[in-house]
Amino acid sequence: SVLSVYHHWDGYPEWLGRILTTHYNSRELASELIDGGDMSAAWGDENRAEYYSERGEDCPPRYDETREQFLSEGEEFSYIFTSAGWVCYDMNEFNDKQPEMVEIPEGALMA
C-alpha cells in the first residue's frame, strides 16, 4: 500500500527530489511530511512544508492499495520512499503511461 500527498510547486527531481533527500531522508521524516496532507511546497520560505490545511483546506493523505494504483494517478513526477531512500518516477517521459525511474541529483538544495 502507498500513503501519499499532492505537492503543487516544482515537483521535478532537481528541486523536489533534492528537497526530499536532504530534509526528509528517513522513514520517520517522510511519514511526518506525508501526515500533514497535501501541500503547496515541501520546503518553503519558513524552512518547512507549507500545507493546505494551514489555510483551512481539508486535504488529508491519499491511500492506494498498490504501488501500481498510486503510479496510475497521472502526476508528472511521483516519489516513493523505500528502504533505500527516495525513488522518483517520471510519469510522462514517453507518453506511454509507463513510469520511468529517473535519478534524483545529489547534493543539498538551498531553498
Language-model features, listed with the residues they occupy:
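Short, extreme N-terminal segment that most often corresponds to the first beta-strand
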Residues: S1-G11
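Extracellular/luminal recognition modules and glycoprotein regions
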Residues: G11-L20
